[in-house]
């Protein structure tokens, strides 16, 4: 992996191989989302951003036939389809930073990379405490979580209509890809 990291640092891409090649089968079979798709979601977390993107997508849909269902969905449709559903992503942790909040609570900021790019996410509270040992640089991990309305984890949360709500990815489970591989073999 050091050789691949040097290669990427020098020319900006992995040329001879990708660090995930050893786990390609597992990543493709177990995962239902990618870094690219999660970054697109991040651009749609606010209602204003979703409305602007929807208008642009609608213009493009009117001008051409969409063959890929993912491209045909507006941001609100994508969120409606995925909110509350399990999302699974596999990759290699390329950056890991353990931090402390102003109140003294530990949390972490991470970047995972797959075949489509990189995605930055955070872990807080019990999720951080439970999984921080796995979320280390160069670890091959399998993430599970859901798309939910921002604040949904709080006791007195009142949901808003999809058109008005802000959304976030809520990390719920982390495991090593090799352990997820065992789950795949048991199917």
How would you label these PLM feature ranges?
Residues 1-187:
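Noncatalytic, beta-rich nucleic-acid-contacting surfaces in large DNA/RNA-processing enzymes
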């Amino acid at each position: 992996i050091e050789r691949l990291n040097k290669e990427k640092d020098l020319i900006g891409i992995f040329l001879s191989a990708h660090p995930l090649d050893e786990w390609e089968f597992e990543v493709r079979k177990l995962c239902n989302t990618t870094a690219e798709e999660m970054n697109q979601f991040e651009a749609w977390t606010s209602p204003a951003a979703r409305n602007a993107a929807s208008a642009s997508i609608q213009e493009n849909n009117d001008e051409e036939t969409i063959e890929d269902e993912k491209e045909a969905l507006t941001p609100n449709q994508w969120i409606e389809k995925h909110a509350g559903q399990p999302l699974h992503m596999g990759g290699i942790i390329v950056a890991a930073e353990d931090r402390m909040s102003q109140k003294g609570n530990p949390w972490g900021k991470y970047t995972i990379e797959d075949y489509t790019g990189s995605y930055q996410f955070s872990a807080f509270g019990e999720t951080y405490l439970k999984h921080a040992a796995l979320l280390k640089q160069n670890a091959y991990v399998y993430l599970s979580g859901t798309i939910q309305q921002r604040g949904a984890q709080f006791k007195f949360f009142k949901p808003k209509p999809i058109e008005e709500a802000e959304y976030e990815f809520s990390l719920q489970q982390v495991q090593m890809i090799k352990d997820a591989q065992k789950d795949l073999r048991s199917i």
